[in-house]
Structure formats: C-alpha cells, structure tokens
Amino acid sequence: MKKIKCALIGPGNIGTDLLAKLQRSAVLEPVWMVGIDPESDGLKRAREMGIKTTSDGVDGLIPHMKADGVQIVFDATSAYVHAENSRKVNEQGALMIDLTPAAIGPFCVPPVNLKAHVGSGEMNVNMVTCGGQATIPMVAAVSRVQPVAYGEIVATVSSRSVGPGTRKNIDEFTRTTAGAVEKVGGARKGKAIIVINPAEPPLMMRDTVHCLTETEPDQAAITASVHAMLAEVQKYVPGYRLVNGPVFDGNRVSVFLEVEGLGDYLPKYAGNLDIMTAAAARTAEMFAEEILKGELVLQPTAVAA
C-alpha cells in the first residue's frame, strides 16, 4: 500500500517518540528528521534508522521536500519558531501538524473533534499540549451531557520527560490548554495548570479534571459519557486509565486519570509523550487516508489556514 511521506522537525523527546510511532503506521512513512544540533541523540537515532537528517533547521529540509515527496510535516520544536516553520512548509504545499503550543491553526483533540477536520482543507492543525490531549476529552465528556460553566485541568508530569523545548513554553502551555478546554472541551471558562515533578524514580503522568456544571449534574449520564470517552482515547493510547471518578460534589464533577506510555523512547512513565505523539499520528493518518483516496489535495499556501 502506498504511504504518505512525512518529515519531523525537532529531534527531542516528543519528536523521537513520534518517529517510533510513525514507523509502525500503515499509511505514513517518515523520511526526514530535522534538528539544529548535529550531535543530538534524536538525529543520531534517526540516522541509524535510515532516515535522512539535517542539522540546519527547517531550511535544510525545504529544498528536498518536493523531490522526496514530503506531504506532511510534524513540528515538535517550540512555539516561538513554529509560525515561521509552518509558513515555509505550507509554501511547499505540505500540511503542518503542530505539536508546540503555538496554536496558529485550529485545535485537534482526536476523540472530540478529529472528524470535524475532515474535508476542511486546513494546512495547519494544532495538537494543543500533552495535558490538553489527556484532559480535554473528559471535559468534553461532561459538556456533551450538560453545560459546563468552568473547567480546570491539572497535568502532573515527571521532570525527566519534560525537555528544554517544553520548559521554555510553560506559559504557552497554560494559555493554549486553557483556550482548548473552552474551544474543544466546551467549558465556558477554562484554566490549566502544569506541575513538573522531580521525584525519582519518575512518576507516571497524572491528570485531574474538575468541571463545574451550570445545573445539578446528571450523575448517571455523565458517568456513562466519561466511560464512553475513556474507551475512545484508549483506542490510540492504551495506557490511558481512569483512576477515580467521576466524583460528584454539588455541581463539581472531578475525574482522576493516569497515562502510561508505550515506552517507545522514554520509559512508560512518560505517558505525556505518548498521548501527544499518538494523537498527532492519529490525526496525520486521517489526513493521509484522505490524500490517498484523492479526497484531499494539498495546495501551497502563503500563510497557514
């Protein structure tokens, strides 16, 4: 079966984990890994796998995109450089999947709104953040039952799983995640908190979701909705688990989650990498299937859609 060729920008924790997942895909074929440090572990690993690499940043990739047939590019760098990366990639007629909190394109949280992106012709979609991918499905599970006045999420991740790019983007992480809690999760007001835990041995990713419903919560309907959403997320992140909840206290609905990774790059405690990279791969596969069917024709654009 024909596969759609992909490039990855950013050979850090997220990019390296994503590369492992793309290599198992039936419709995606990673052919380039782009970095800025020739000595980086991620570039070395990619080279060993037979992937083409450049340490000249996105400018080292652009001249080769057409010849190598690259149609989908993943950006796992930093929010600060994403807009420029996206502009250059879109000009080449390739779709950009943004794993930074830049959020210049529409948010995509697969179990909630992936189908809404089908046929919309976007050239840039944003995967929110790892905390967003873990928690927004649960906010949406409550808000599809009844209106949510306020949604608050707390993502706790191990220090070892948080690379320099993510650390530089903490403010963007909280802003972007809070925005997506509203736009995708359906809460009228959203708030996001990230906790980076330095404990050794490293702790598994844990997430807490609190929703305040406008009226008294329909406990049976919300519980059923949460369990249905849990099953949807587990289709692409098998280590996504409901630890407790939904717990009801007045109008507050609380859900407690943990996310175990597949251990593709970092060990299984780094579920935050897995949920982000699995969601990005799932999204890219949907676009790739559309391209292969001839239903999506990518057009060069001057700016991201």
Swiss-Prot record:
GO terms for molecular function: acetaldehyde dehydrogenase (acetylating) activity; NAD binding. This is Acetaldehyde dehydrogenase. Its EC number is 1.2.1.10. It catalyses: acetaldehyde + NAD(+) + CoA = acetyl-CoA + NADH + H(+). It comes from Leptothrix cholodnii (strain ATCC 51168 / LMG 8142 / SP-6). Pfam families: AcetDehyd-dimer. One of its GO terms (biological process) is catabolic process. Gene3D superfamilies: Dihydrodipicolinate Reductase, domain 2, NAD(P)-binding Rossmann-like Domain. The active site is at C130 (acyl-thioester intermediate). NAD(+) binds at S161, V162, G163, P164, G165, T166, R167, K168, N169, N272. Keywords: Aromatic hydrocarbons catabolism, NAD, Oxidoreductase. Belongs to the acetaldehyde dehydrogenase family. The keyword Amino-acid biosynthesis does not apply.
